[in-house]
Amino acid sequence: MDKLSLYGETFTSRLLIGSALYPSPAIMLDSVRASGAEIITLSLRRQNPAQQDGKAIWDYIRSSGCKLLPNTAGCKSAKEAVTLAEMSREIFQTDWLKLEVIGDDYTLQPDPYGLVEAAKELSKRGFKVLPYCTEDLVLCRRLLDAGCEALMPWGAPIGTGQGLLNKYNLGMLRERLPDTPMIIDAGLGAPSHATEAMEMGFDAVLLNTAIAKAHDPVGMGVAFKLAVEAGRAGYNAGLMLKRQTASPSTPTIGMPFWRRHD
């Protein structure tokens, strides 16, 4: 079976899901289950199980049975990210980490310098780092050199729902790093965006807002599940090459009245 492989572990689902912004913890849990996701992201700052206000959400997340992927959301320096990562490892008992180091409050674009610095230090400390990054090829290579075994390039700024804004760079990134697991993270707003990412050969997608803010989060979880599966199946089957001119699907050989119009 075609499975997702990350840091020596395999997963049936290629959809990763976030745990924030849902109308209620119960709807969050139902949406996660409907999506079929096996990895769920969470923030220590929002969902610290040691604090009373985070206990209810933590109980729901734990009951989902998903693998936990803590993130360093809100960190603006490598030092902050490393500190929060160590706290998350102690509290959530996992060395998996979605690394975020934000360089701009308006676009929430990752800070490439802080990201590489933090990735290098965290890899030395034994973390399995999945960095949230841009589609910049040079940056992605630096992250791999820093010890990351997978990458999480954005499709568009977080929460915008714009889909894949820079398809050329994303396509080039996929082509130049064919053996690196890559998860499109952030900016996906519709199931069709997820399908497109999978058709391009990306290994998985991670999203939150598109499901959490839908009118029916549970139904949207199902929609994204099917979209990811369809996109992956299409990629594996091999998409037809695009053409600049029309090509009839019905043969014209032997048709008595066919002629070419210039």
From Swiss-Prot:
Molecular-function GO terms, alphabetical: thiazole synthase activity
| Major site of localization recorded for this protein | cytoplasm
Annotated localization: Cytoplasm
Determine the domain of life of the protein's source: Bacteria
- Subunit text: Homotetramer. Forms heterodimers with either ThiH or ThiS.
Q: Which GO terms describe its biological process?
A: thiamine diphosphate biosynthetic process
Catalytic activity as recorded in UniProt = [ThiS sulfur-carrier protein]-C-terminal-Gly-aminoethanethioate + 2-iminoacetate + 1-deoxy-D-xylulose 5-phosphate = [ThiS sulfur-carrier protein]-C-terminal Gly-Gly + 2-[(2R,5Z)-2-carboxy-4-methylthiazol-5(2H)-ylidene]ethyl phosphate + 2 H2O + H(+)
The function of this protein is:
Catalyzes the rearrangement of 1-deoxy-D-xylulose 5-phosphate (DXP) to produce the thiazole phosphate moiety of thiamine. Sulfur is provided by the thiocarboxylate moiety of the carrier protein ThiS. In vitro, sulfur can be provided by H(2)S.
Q: Give the organism, scientific name.
A: Hahella chejuensis (strain KCTC 2396)
Entry annotation: catalytic residues: 98 (schiff-base intermediate with dxp)
Q: What class of enzyme is it?
A: transferase
- Entry-linked HAMAP family: ThiG
Q: What is this protein called?
A: Thiazole synthase
